């Protein structure tokens, strides 16, 4: 058997951090060896990553690669002559570039500068974006590839429109959400906005004959998003609470507001990688809690027609739903709601989900959703129960 290995340099923008080697072992497990260290300052090294830990660095590199369960992952990688298990190849082609942070990995003889390759400022490979969204097309080899470090399972693609970096996220029918996920993102954003929460703004648009939710990038070349999972030794709610408490009361209250909001909209997909903090890339210091995003799997994402027969039918169904974090929405309400969250929820009283200019569910369905939303917010405010 021929064993494959390759050496890379981990860089923070144009600063060399360390040299490492990845081996593709005979048992299919990659091994990483740190060969040389250059600039290991805490202000430069990936935050919350233990300095000089080879196993942790390898896991970090794996996590910034395209998920194996991503929609059209085989089509994306196939267009680049890669496979989903080819970590060395994916790092070589994509250079580990991300829209989350300023890190990248390059081959040891690479001479290019970050300004000419980073995803924040440079043109995307539009043909790969189309493959990522539709599963169809051919790579034309033009532009940087933004799809190799984007998390999530649904079909999605980064686009550059009028100077903004924008994410288009669609809905693959095999996930049995019937095309409702974009509506859910839009309605959830409108509720969070009404509450006064720090939330990513979502719009709706049609691309390649498919409805998509659309949002602008909330990071930039000077500000990173770091998911909360990176800061935890144990992946449970207690650890999350302790982390946000350690940052101060404002951080903790922001976290509590997120948990109450999730309970209100029955967001069953709040996991440890879709919330976190924003980090100043110049100092590697935490700035604030990241804006809320990724609410497509909530009570607004229910395609089954029979659920909309009545408010009672819909409520009976969503009362069977449970959050990823902890064991019930009702317990989260009781544990995380204080006066600030009550004030935020009170702003939803009498609020109606707005119609989009172009793309909408039927009036009957929207009426059911509005009735359910009002019933939930009243129940929470009156009784702290759902």
Regions from the PLM with identified roles:
Residues 1-260, 264-266, 278-386:
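Phosphate/dinucleotide-binding and metal-coordinating scaffold of catalytic cores
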């Amino acid at each position: 058997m021929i064993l494959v290995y390759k050496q890379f340099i981990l860089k923070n923008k144009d600063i060399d951090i360390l040299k490492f080697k990845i081996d593709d072992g005979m048992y299919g497990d990659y091994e990483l060896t740190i060969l040389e260290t250059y600039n290991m300052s805490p202000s430069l090294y990936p935050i919350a990553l233990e300095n000089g830990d080879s196993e942790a660095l390898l896991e970090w590199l794996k996590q910034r690669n395209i998920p194996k369960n991503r929609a059209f992952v085989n089509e994306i990688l196939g267009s680049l002559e890669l496979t989903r298990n080819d970590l060395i190849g994916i790092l070589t082609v994509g250079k580990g570039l991300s829209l989350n942070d300023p890190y990248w990995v390059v081959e040891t003889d690479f001479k290019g500068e970050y300004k000419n390759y980073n995803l924040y400022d440079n043109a995307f490979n539009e043909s790969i974006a189309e493959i990522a969204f539709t599963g169809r097309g051919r790579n034309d080899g033009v532009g940087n590839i933004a799809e190799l470090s984007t998390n999530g399972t649904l079909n999605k693609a980064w686009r550059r429109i009028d100077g903004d970096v924008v994410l288009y996220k669609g809905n693959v029918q095999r996930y049995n959400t019937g095309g409702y996920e974009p509506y859910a993102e839009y309605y959830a954003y409108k509720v969070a906005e009404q509450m006064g929460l720090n939330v990513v703004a979502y719009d709706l648009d049609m691309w390649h004959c498919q409805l998509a939710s659309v949002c602008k990038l909330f990071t930039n070349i000077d500000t990173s998003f770091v998911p909360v999972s990176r800061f935890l030794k144990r992946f449970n709610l207690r650890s999350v609470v302790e982390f946000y408490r350690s940052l101060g009361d404002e951080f903790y209250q922001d976290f509590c507001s997120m948990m109450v909001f999730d309970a209100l909209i029955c967001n069953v997909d709040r996991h440890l990688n879709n919330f976190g903090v924003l980090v100043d890339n110049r100092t590697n210091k935490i700035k604030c809690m990241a804006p809320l995003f990724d609410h497509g799997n909530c009570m607004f994402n229910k395609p089954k027609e029979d659920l909309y027969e009545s408010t009672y039918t819909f409520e009976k169904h969503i009362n069977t739903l449970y959050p990823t974090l902890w064991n019930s929405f009702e317990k989260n309400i009781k544990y995380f709601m204080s006066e600030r969250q009550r004030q935020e929820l009170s702003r939803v009283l009498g609020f109606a989900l707005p119609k989009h200019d172009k793309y909408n569910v039927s009036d009957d369905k929207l009426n059911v959703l509005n009735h359910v939303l009002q019933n939930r917010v009243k129940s929470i405010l009156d009784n702290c129960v759902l």
